[in-house]
Amino acid sequence: VLQRLSLRTLALVALMTMPSQALDIDFEGNVELELRHFPNPARHQDMEDNFASLAAEIELGFFSPSGRHAVIIKPFARYDQHDHERSHGDLREAKYRYVNGSFEATVGVDKEFWGVTEFLHLVDIINQTDNVESIDGEQKLGQPMVKFSYASRYGTLSAYSLPFFRIRQYADPVTGRPNSGFIVDDNTSHFESGEGRRTDDYALRYQNNFGPFDIGLSWFDGTAREPQLLVPFPPEASGLANGLPMLQAYYAYLTQAGLDVQATLGSWLLKLEATQSTQNRHLPDPRFDNRPSLDMDIAEVQTDRATGGIEYTFYNFFDSGTDLGLVAEYMYDERKQKAPHPFGNDIGIGLRWTANDPQSTAILLGGLIDLDTDSTSISLEAERRLGRSFKAILEARFQDKVGADDDGAQDGFAAALADEDFMRFRLTYYF
């Protein structure tokens, strides 16, 4: 409630201080119909195979004639037929922005993207992932912040104060899909900081370009956006869903240094993201198949991660008027198979075709290969504008192979999604 009142007060004060006699007002938005289909039978009888949902997003902007002042509000909401956790709303943006020459200040709720790579974004840490919107991590929740930026010929320096934390949501424990084999209790979260969602997180970022190189350096100090999922103790403490104990999210204190580099060399793009982070994590519990639990001690873990690769574009491919891009990236985590995510030692390969037609037709085909287990997954995204106001998007994701390492241990991440292939169709109307 306090956050909502503060944002309302901010918006009213900002609007009253802007010159009203020539205020520019922009209003736009979209409404989306989404259909999802899971061709394989669900793990549990209460889970559905077909989902329909409606989503809407609007953007309202107030701009002063000088361009120095702006208030932008962008709410988002979705209603899902079966997944109650996916039926949610979010304030993507609700900010006042002031620009004066090389100086810029932003106060309110905003979204910030850092990074250059295609398959995995390591340095992108400001906003929490909107996990129920899409499993690829591309959708983000709005983050309350105060941001100051200064640009000069020596580069751009930005400082962020992040006073409120957003938890990560998970699919409905009874009906939601895709289901990764574990169920998370969204109602119970644990924070190392002791302050809960009230945080004193901060971040710094420096950006500059040197000839063909675009370079970013970043530092983050605060609550980790990605939680460690723990078995509660006793296991039945959070209750059962579909006969399984529900896991609980633990958000550790995190410090992270990041580097992102992109070199543009004609038709070539060379990309790199690297991070070094330190945080406390609960140790594996042998009573629960070495899954970490709240009953285990905490140890400090320092982790080095990197991802990078190349992208080459064939412009006017075979004189067709279309462009074909080839993407190849490698993803590394020094923990390899012990990493709490599937990107420990993987290669991503992609093809991006754009028709360059009035309908903005584009197709993206991607594949991930785990070099330790030979597990493979495939994704396809195709989009096309229909007339002036509609866009159709088709997406499909398949776990093609579930492999095992040299010791015969099955790839747990691939096995968890083996029966969760899905197709998604979206029809969006823009106004």
Region roles according to the model:
Residues L23-I25, L60-S64, R97-N100, V109, ...:
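Residue-level signature of outer-membrane beta-barrel architecture
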Residues L33-P41, A70-Q81, R92, T129, ...:
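Transmembrane beta-strand segments that form the barrel wall of outer-membrane beta-barrel proteins
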Residues P41-M47, R78-H82, D130-S134, T188-E192, ...:
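Extracellular loop and loop/strand-boundary signature of outer-membrane beta-barrel proteins
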Residues E48-A56, S87-R92, G101, K140-P144, ...:
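Residues that define the transmembrane beta-barrel architecture of outer-membrane proteins
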Residues G61-R177, G211, R397, K401:
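Outer membrane beta-barrel
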Residues G67-V71, S102-A105, Y154-L157, P212-I215, ...:
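Repeated loop/turn-to-beta-strand initiation elements of outer-membrane beta-barrel proteins
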Residues F148, I310, A415-F431:
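Outer-membrane beta-barrel "beta-signal"
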Residues G222, L265-P284, F288-I369:
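Detector for outer-membrane/organellar transmembrane beta-barrel domains
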